[in-house]
Regions:
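GST superfamily/GST-like fold recognition
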Residues: 134-147
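GST-like domain detector, emphasizing the conserved glutathione-binding G-site
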Residues: 1-115, 122, 126-129
Length: 147
């Protein structure tokens, strides 16, 4: 979702293909043996396999709404936020949301840990209009599918 948002905002034309993850097409697996979505195959053969990378690529081409402003202003904070979102937060979210695939006995612990991270988001939002600062940007749209 966040990769598509960035590609759309950047105004980049791409061919979207819906992938049924239980029946992955050979061409998809050839481009990305990892077999996860999203995948963007660039004209030069470069393959982007992470939504965060797709967002960065698209917005580096065209950033009409200034989503990357926060990254230009504070690259260390931006990287740390995205690392926490894509790492610990996503881990806690998955282990709570899909507890039956993991350890159901720890689901509530993961919910509490994820809630603590959301409380940090709330603290930031109490001080300014968006996670990215004065206007919605990269951090807000990167977090959107998870909250």
């Amino acid at each position: 979702m966040r990769a598509r948002l960035a590609v759309s905002t950047a105004g980049i034309q791409v061919e979207l293909r819906e992938i049924l993850l239980r029946d992955k097409p050979d061409a998809f697996l050839h481009a990305s043996p990892k077999g996860t979505v999203p995948v963007v195959e660039l004209a030069d053969g470069t393959v982007l396999e992470e939504s965060r990378d797709v967002m960065q690529w698209a917005l580096s081409q065209n950033d009409p709404d200034g989503w990357l402003d926060v990254q230009h202003q504070d690259p260390d904070h931006t990287a740390a936020f995205l690392d926490a979102l894509d790492g610990p937060f996503k881990t806690h979210l998955d282990r709570y949301k899909y507890a039956s695939r993991f350890d159901p006995d720890t689901a509530l612990e993961h919910r509490a840990a994820g809630a603590a991270m959301l409380a940090e988001f709330e603290t930031r939002l109490a001080a300014r209009p968006s996670l990215s600062g004065e206007k919605n940007g990269l951090l807000d749209f990167a977090a959107l599918p998870f909250v």
